[in-house]
Regions:
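Repeated loop/turn-to-beta-strand initiation elements of outer-membrane beta-barrel proteins
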Residues: 22-25, 67-70, 109-113, 157-160, ...
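Residue-level signature of outer-membrane beta-barrel architecture
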Residues: 16-19, 52, 61-63, 93, ...
């Protein structure tokens, strides 16, 4: 009932420079423009929107000892949005900025990284609380947090990987004053993934894998939360000269959990125990 046509075009340039002892700098610019037209056959209205923006990014890395470095980066984003509100106005593009700083280590089979970030997004389209089936732009959202990752290759064919994310979110500007200061819906504050592989010494072609996924409590709205959950996965793979066969199972113990929700009373159950088989051929 409301077909939309969106056209975008962009051009960008980027440069990386190494200088001094262990320093690397990266910078770039991107120009993007968009044209959107939507015809609402129900309300007999049309809207055309032209948008353009120049975004930039910059980063610097310093390797202060072999395999160990620190870095900082800044980036901007520009994302055209399809659709229009109840009054027939086309949506403005979503824009954002992100700061990130951290450290990375990679040496002798060990890798690790730690990073802090601060992300802000503006002109976010969300469900219209008054007119069902429509969306409105709600202002600004902010996400700050910490990300940790590590991997290690040990003796006897063992390999471990792990990742943890702490994310604090909030609505910083909104057309609905009650939303300001509230966390974003369906964004867990804590998330953890751990995975291990074991290549059998007696059968090097055979690899066993197992891991755990944890997702913390998620804010639905002022009325409810989705509870935290933990699920376990496992796999077995056989590798030949130029192919690999893998069989896996997700949610090994068939735990019931909720992965998301549309609104109060309409939640999405997580996937029950499920199996998959993949075959990869290497050229």
């Amino acid at each position: 009932d409301a077909p939309t046509r969106l056209r975008t075009a962009a051009i960008y340039m980027q440069d990386q420079i190494k200088f001094g002892q262990g320093w690397t700098a990266l910078a770039g610019l991107r120009y993007e423009k968009s044209r959107q037209r939507q015809d609402d056959h129900v309300k007999n209205t049309s809207a055309t929107q032209h948008d353009s923006d120049v975004t930039g990014m910059a980063g610097i890395v310093y390797e202060f000892t072999p395999g160990w470095s620190v870095y900082a980066s800044y980036s901007q984003s520009f994302l055209p949005q399809m659709g229009q509100d109840y009054h027939g106005n086309a949506f403005k593009p979503e824009t954002g900025t992100q700061w990130e700083a951290g450290t990375k280590y990679a040496r002798d089979g060990w890798t690790a990284s730690a990073a802090v970030f601060d992300l802000r997004k503006r002109n976010i389209a969300a469900a219209d609380p008054v007119n069902d089936g429509y969306k409105v732009l709600v202002g600004e959202q902010r996400a700050r947090g910490l990300e940790l990752e590590a991997a290690a290759e040990l003796k006897n064919g063992l390999k471990f990987t792990g990742a943890y994310a702490y994310t604090k979110t909030e609505v910083t500007r909104s057309t609905n004053a009650r939303e300001i200061g509230q966390p974003l819906n369906y964004t867990p504050r804590h998330a953890l993934t751990v995975w291990s592989n074991w290549r059998l010494p007696q059968m090097p072609a055979l690899t066993l894998g197992a891991g755990v996924r944890y997702v913390g409590k998620q804010h639905g709205n002022s009325a409810f939360y989705l509870p935290a959950y933990t699920v376990m996965d496992a796999s077995v793979s056989y590798t030949h000269t130029n192919w690999r066969l893998t069989a896996g199972v997700k949610n090994l113990f068939n735990r019931s959990y909720y992965a998301g929700a549309v609104r109060t009373g309409v939640v999405s159950p997580g996937m029950p125990r499920n199996f998959n088989v993949t075959l990869k051929y290497f050229f």
